[in-house]
Design a protein with these regions (language model features):
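Short beta-strands and strand-coil junctions in structured, solvent-facing domains, enriched
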Residues: 10, 26-29, 46-48, 62-64, ...
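Extracytoplasmic beta-strand/coil segments of soluble accessory domains associated
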Residues: 17-60, 76
Length: 172
C-alpha cells in the first residue's frame, strides 16, 4: 500500500496509528500507553519482545515499539510492505515494514503552521519551515506539541485525570 501527501491530507491522517484505518491488514492498536504500541501486519506482530513490523523513516530504522506512536508533519509518502522484508531491511521485519519518507528541503521550501482543537481541552500546534540556501544545502525544522486534560474523572478529587502532553521535533 502506498500513500502520498495528497492522500494523507485528504484522509486526515496525522499519526502512524491513523495509517491502520486505511491500509488493509495493518493493525496498530491503542493499548493506552505510548510505551507498548505494537503493529501487526496480517495478524503477525509482537506486543512483548522486539517488533515483527519494522518502521523506517528516511531509511533510518526505528527499532523500538514505542516509535509507532508519534504524530508527523512534512510527510512525502508512506509505503506499507507486507510479508517478510528481512532481505532488504534486516531485523524486525518478519511481518512487514512501514516505510515513511519526509519532504526534502531541497525540493520544497516554505513554512506551515497547523492548529488543532477538540474535546476535553485538546489542542495542538505543529510548525515547519524549509529553506534552501544553495543548490546543495537546505534545511528543514519542524516541531509539534499536543495536550489534553484527560477524559477520566477522579471522583475523589473531582478533577479530570489521564491528561496527556506530547511534543517533538526534527531537523533535517
Amino acid at each position: 500500500s502506498y500513500l502520498n501527501t495528497g492522500n494523507l491530507d485528504e484522509m486526515n491522517i496525522r499519526s502512524v496509528k491513523d495509517i491502520s484505518t486505511v491500509v488493509p491488514n495493518l493493525f496498530i492498536p491503542d493499548y493506552g500507553s505510548k510505551l507498548i504500541s505494537s503493529a501487526y501486519i496480517r495478524g503477525i506482530g509482537s506486543r512483548i519482545n522486539s517488533p515483527a513490523v519494522g518502521l523506517y523513516v528516511n531509511n533510518v530504522p526505528y527499532l523500538d515499539k514505542s516509535a509507532f506512536d508519534f504524530d508527523f508533519i512534512d510527510i512525502a509518502s508512506i509505503e506499507v510492505l507486507k510479508g517478510p522484508q528481512g532481505t532488504l531491511y534486516g531485523r524486525n521485519t518478519m511481518a512487514g515494514l512501514v516505510n515513511i519518507k519526509t519532504l526534502s528541503p531541497l525540493e520544497k521550501q516554505g513554512s506551515k503552521i497547523k492548529l488543532s482543537f477538540g474535546n476535553y481541552n485538546l489542542w495542538g500546534v505543529a510548525a515547519t519551515t524549509s529553506q534552501k540556501l544553495t543548490d546543495d544545502f537546505a534545511f528543514s525544522i519542524n516541531a509539534r506539541y499536543r495536550q489534553d486534560d484527560g477524559y477520566f474523572k477522579n471522583e475523589y478529587t473531582r478533577q479530570n485525570s489521564g491528561s496527556t502532553r506530547s511534543g517533538g521535533g526534527r531537523v533535517q
